[in-house]
């Protein structure tokens, strides 16, 4: 059983010996992993640690301001760096999931490298955890913060040395450590948020319009699902065009947009399928049939209108370790409220759907 006190006692001398009198830049996303790593380092090393939040333009609505407020007591020297235009303009128009993730990684570490020079820091502290490098090494998806584990020499590539104190921990253990370090519950209990943020929830080609659509939709989804304490819950957006097919007697609509999955422990990049289903609790039978084909995510139709060009898919999962996950059985009336508000408040949304695919064969995020 994981004991956070023992972990801190063991890691403390190691960190102090490694860092010596050098400065450490701690990359903070506002998620539980990176923030826990930064607070751990700050508690052990004091003002040698410079925590930095890069606003990439892919954060949730008003997130940078919220994170700074949440962390005012535990990371009082947190610096927010506005890189929204740089990231958005460089990735705008890119379509393939892995290409977008890799471009994000390139931009992120280029920005980090500049900050390292600015603050004369030798070490970069990251919140990489076990699930991150397992997925990247397995070729399922590129986690932007996994570097050393896949043979990237950060000293040669960007001129800094990496410190990853949480690299052998899983999400539930990181939460225990966060509580032990007295992080505010808004951080210790918050659901995971990917490093590339809403970039990987803007499925297919990145456009500014689609990015803002998913930012608003995600805000609505979180508002309604916060009270349920699901492991992770969010919205994704993609273009609504595609075509109808019949697969093993099941009527389905296949979108042109594609999404990441994991089949046989390897990455799959397949179709997103929509079906009509009266009961999301009884979805397993047709999901099992459809994912035998080139399909990674199966969605149930919730509500739609005649005009609009974007589909919004709601994703909510329950999991212990994020290596496997089951979709949440959200009450029908809650899904109806979410769908209604999204269609009412966000222009250009044609339909709202619910993802009824477990992990595997889907990944939790679509990209």
Curated annotation (Swiss-Prot):
Does the record carry Nucleotide-binding as a key word? yes
| Record protein name field | GMP synthase [glutamine-hydrolyzing] subunit B
Reactions accelerated catalytically: XMP + L-glutamine + ATP + H2O = GMP + L-glutamate + AMP + diphosphate + 2 H(+)
Q: Which GO terms describe its molecular function?
A: ATP binding; GMP synthase activity
Q: What residues bind ATP, as annotated?
A: 29-35
GN (gene name):
guaAB
Coiled-coil ranges (or none): none
* GO CC list: cytosol
Q: Ranges for the GMPS ATP-PPase domain?
A: 2-190
Q: Name one Pfam family in it.
A: NAD_synthase
Q: Which PROSITE patterns match?
A: GMPS_ATP_PPASE
This protein's assembly is summarised as: Heterodimer composed of a glutamine amidotransferase subunit (A) and a GMP-binding subunit (B).
EC number of this enzyme: 6.3.5.2
Keywords per UniProt: ATP-binding, GMP biosynthesis, Ligase, Nucleotide-binding, Purine biosynthesis
Q: Which organism is it from?
A: Saccharolobus islandicus (strain M.14.25 / Kamchatka #1) (Sulfolobus islandicus)
SUPFAM superfamilies the record matches: Adenine nucleotide alpha hydrolases-like (SSF52402), GMP synthetase C-terminal dimerisation domain (SSF54810)
For this protein, the record's HAMAP family field holds: GMP_synthase_B
InterPro entries in UniProt:
GMP_synth_C, GMP_synthase_B, GMPS_ATP_PPase_dom, NAD/GMP_synthase, Rossmann-like_a/b/a_fold
Q: In which pathway does it act?
A: Purine metabolism; GMP biosynthesis; GMP from XMP (L-Gln route): step 1/1
Q: What does this protein do?
A: Catalyzes the synthesis of GMP from XMP.
């Amino acid at each position: 059983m994981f004991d956070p006190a023992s972990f801190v006692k063991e890691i403390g001398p190691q960190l102090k010996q490694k860092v010596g009198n050098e400065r450490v830049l701690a990359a903070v996303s506002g998620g539980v992993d990176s923030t826990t790593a930064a607070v751990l380092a700050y508690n052990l090393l004091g003002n040698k640690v410079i925590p930095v939040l890069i606003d990439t333009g892919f954060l949730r609505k008003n997130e940078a301001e919220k994170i700074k407020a949440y962390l005012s007591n535990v990371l009082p020297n947190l610096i927010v760096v506005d890189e929204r235009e740089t990231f958005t303009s460089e990735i705008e128009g890119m379509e393939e999931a892995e290409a977008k993730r890799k471009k994000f990684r390139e931009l992120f570490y280029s920005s980090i490298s500049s900050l390292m020079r600015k603050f004369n820091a030798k070490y970069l502290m990251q919140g990489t955890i076990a699930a991150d490098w397992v997925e990247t090494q397995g070729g399922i998806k590129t986690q932007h913060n996994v570097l050393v584990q896949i043979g990237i020499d950060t000293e040669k590539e960007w001129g800094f040395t990496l410190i990853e104190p949480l690299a052998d921990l899983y999400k539930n253990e990181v939460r225990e450590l966060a509580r032990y370090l007295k992080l505010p519950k808004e951080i210790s209990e918050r659901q995971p948020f990917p490093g590339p943020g809403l970039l990987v929830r803007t499925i297919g080609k990145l456009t500014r319009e689609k990015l803002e659509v998913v930012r608003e939709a995600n805000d609505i989804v979180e508002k309604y699902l916060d009270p349920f304490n699901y492991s992770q819950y969010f919205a994704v957006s993609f273009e609504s065009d595609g075509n109808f097919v019949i697969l093993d007697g099941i009527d389905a609509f296949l979108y042109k947009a594609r999404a990441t999955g994991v089949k046989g422990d390897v990455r799959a990049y397949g179709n997103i399928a929509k079906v009509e289903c009266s009961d999301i609790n009884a979805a397993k039978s047709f999901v099992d049939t459809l994912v035998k084909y080139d399909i990674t995510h199966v969605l149930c139709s919730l509500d739609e209108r005649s005009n609009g060009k974007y589909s919004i898919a709601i994703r909510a999962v329950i999991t212990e370790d994020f290596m496997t996950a089951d979709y949440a059985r959200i009450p029908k009336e809650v899904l109806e409220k979410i769908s209604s508000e999204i269609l009412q408040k966000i222009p250009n949304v044609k339909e709202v759907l619910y993802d009824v695919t477990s992990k595997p064969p889907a990944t939790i995020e679509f990209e």
